[in-house]
Each structure stands twice: as C-alpha cells, then as structure tokens.
C-alpha cells in the first residue's frame, strides 16, 4: 500500500466469543461463515484492510492458550482469503500465531503489546518482510474499573509526560523491530487509545 497518500479503513473481525465491542463471532456452529459474510460486507463498504483477532483485549477478559487462538483465527483467515481480495492483518502478540497466520494468508501483524510480550515476534516479522503495527500499551489485564456509563475499562497508568512517555516507549518498540531487521518503512505506530489510559488521556491523544 502507498502509505501517506490517504487514510486507510480497517474492518475488524473478532473471532472471539467475548469481544470488547460486543461483536465477537466465535459463537454458534456457523461462526466462520458469519466472519466471511462480515468480511464481504466490509469489502462492499469500502474497507482497505481486514484485521482478524482471536483473543479479546476487553477489560477483564480471560487469557487463552496459543492453541485456542490458532483454532479461532486460522479457519477464518483461510476462508476470508478465499472469498475477499483484501489484505489481512493478524491481531496477535504471539510469535507462533503470527507465523501460522502469515503462512495461512495474512499480510501483516498487529501487535497490541508492541513486540514486548513475545521475544520472537520481531524476528518473525523481519523474516516475513511484512508490515507490523506496534501499539503502545501499559494496561494491566486485572487492573480494571467498572463505570455505569462506560462499562469496564482499563485503569489509567501514571505518566510523567503522557505524550513524551508514549513516544519514548514506542521508540523502544521500534528499536526492537529495527534490531531484528524489520524495514523501517514497514512499521506502523498505534498510540493505544483506550489501553492503560484515562478518558482524559485518551482525549488528549486524539
């Protein structure tokens, strides 16, 4: 894709039963077909990229194993790849899941932990020569608050300088990618709105 020429639209396909946005598809016997229909609708609506994830990042969600994640995402990637001609992003922080997803037809990796959770992830991305979305994330899975209007949310972390700290920590993730041999032109940065930040901090980022 020619980066920088325009804004690209990503359609999110949650192959989970417990999505943050309430649209998890991994329920019922025909959930793979449901995911394909959603992908087709995204394509018809003008999406440029499809992002497929198998582990919920919603506040209070329970972690799953790599085997469970693979069982959710691989059938969807395979089926979507056969029916929709759009690049597929695999939303995972696990190197072995990313590797299998890329082999199944994904085009890039979206890591919500910015290469910090799995030491092999940067190497997998470098070997594949694919784009990598590096997200800033200080959230702690069990550090969750419930609010009447907002529902569950991650509790904001302490920042000495919100923008400066995020830039510094993203640079650390960039350095991990570059050290592994990832091409700088393939790195996409995500400031992590909603992850380990208060509502006010999220507004400041936006």
Can you say where each PLM-predicted feature lies in the sequence?
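Short beta-strand/loop segments at the ligand-binding rim of alpha/beta enzyme cores
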Residues: 7-9, 83-91, 108, 184, ...
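Conserved beta-strand positions in the central sheet of alpha/beta enzyme cores
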Residues: 48-51, 89, 110-111, 133-134, ...
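Glycine-rich, proline-tolerant flexible connector loops at the mouths of alpha/beta enzymes
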Residues: 19-23, 48-75, 193-199
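Conserved, mostly hydrophobic/aromatic
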Residues: 13, 42, 46, 91, ...
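Glycine-rich anion/phosphate-binding loops
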Residues: 21-41, 67-71, 115, 119, ...
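Catalytic domains of carbohydrate-active enzymes, especially glycoside hydrolases
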Residues: 37-53
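Alpha-helix-loop-beta-strand connector modules within alpha/beta enzyme cores
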Residues: 62-90, 95, 99, 127-137, ...
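Conserved anion-binding
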Residues: 15-22, 57-58, 104, 115-197
């Amino acid at each position: 894709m020619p980066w920088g020429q325009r804004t690209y639209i990503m359609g999110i396909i949650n192959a989970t039963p417990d999505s943050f946005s309430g649209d998890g598809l991994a329920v019922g016997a025909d959930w793979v077909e449901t995911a394909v229909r959603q992908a087709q609708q995204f394509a018809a609506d003008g999406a440029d990229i499809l992002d497929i994830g198998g582990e919920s990042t919603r506040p209070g969600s329970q972690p799953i194993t790599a085997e469970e994640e693979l069982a959710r995402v691989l059938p969807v990637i395979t089926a979507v790849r056969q029916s929709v001609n759009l690049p597929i992003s695999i939303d995972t922080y696990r190197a072995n899941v990313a590797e299998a997803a890329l082999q199944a037809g994904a085009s890039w990796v979206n890591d919500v932990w910015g290469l910090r959770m799995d030491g092999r992830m940067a190497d997998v991305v470098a070997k594949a020569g694919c784009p990598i979305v590096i997200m800033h994330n200080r959230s702690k899975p069990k550090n969750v608050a419930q609010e009447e209007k907002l529902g569950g949310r991650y509790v904001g972390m302490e920042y000495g300088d919100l923008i400066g700290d995020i830039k510094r920590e993203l640079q650390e993730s960039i350095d991990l990618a570059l050290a592994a041999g990832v091409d700088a032109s393939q790195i996409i940065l995500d400031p992590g709105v909603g992850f380990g930040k208060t509502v006010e901090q999220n507004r400041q980022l936006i």
